[in-house]
């Protein structure tokens, strides 16, 4: 007799996700949003700037050791370019004559850029080299993400079977569940393919030197991700969101659809036209496949292969969210501080498309109010997806709540792009 047990995922249509403004107010009152917001207000969750998580020593007040496995600043671009600071230093430098200050200022800006490019190239090489062993163990291209999703699902099922470990609906306390991979390793495995941009990037920098910044500002996709300046990053973020929020139906995954009851509609990847799949994949910041392959898939109408790539993004965001939430909610509010870097916060907002066309995410994260707005958007996004799930504070698995590979969750949801009026 075959002793194997088949695991069947049960789908329960969500009954609280509405299509009007009531949704936003309902999310703010949810236990998960309150728990996340409380940790931020109490200082348990901090947004940290200018910290080298790869350094051998860290500041005495650094929220280590958890942050070192949470952030990968070396694989992300700067959030602030010190242009005005450099010009101000030249202005106050008495050794530089007045007639030379203008040229000297811009010369030093150029040198700073070249130095940042050098650091970016070195970090790209380090990320690729340091993750070589993990890449063999967790091959993203060969189903590693699906295996990690199944691992999380087994955690959820085991929690359900062990009813004593289920949290109350008002606590939003995440039961401790170590995963076989930490977040830093996960995101660096996704970002390691930036190394293939180095030959063209290095050639352009070698030929044009300081002028290359203009090329990378107008053509940011040529530049390795961690070498982008805030100007190039803004142009890139605008290009990503432009197609997503377009009124034309062949952009992104299409408009967010609702059932007659006002709940978010379940939609599998195979229900989406090939053109929409292609446009979404080419606009995702950390693509796991080259654009020329995607173009071939589209031309040959290989919808299954395009759907596979969509599912990888769906799985990656689910795992990334799960690791972040576990880190934030598993800590003792009074004893442990969780540090999420400003670069990681901006990248989370970019990948989940929680911003408007024209938003300067780097400028926002360097402003107190702007940073809070970005965090609230992320909290609302997490609350919509994970409130009332077993991993946090509920009774349903994630698949039961939303269905398997519900790509409606990848669509742009304007209600989650909250403003400063969300407290």
From Swiss-Prot:
Keyword Transmembrane helix: yes
GO biological process: protein insertion into mitochondrial inner membrane from matrix; response to antibiotic
Transmembrane parts of this sequence: 199-219
GO CC list: mitochondrial inner membrane; mitochondrion
Record's keyword terms, sorted: Antibiotic resistance, Membrane, Mitochondrion, Mitochondrion inner membrane, Transit peptide, Transmembrane, Transmembrane helix
Record membrane topology: Single-pass membrane protein
Compartment annotation: Mitochondrion inner membrane
Additional note from the record: Present with 1460 molecules/cell in log phase SD medium.
Subunit (UniProt): Interacts with COX18. This interaction may be essential for its insertion into mitochondrial inner membrane.
Protein name according to UniProt: Pentamidine resistance factor, mitochondrial
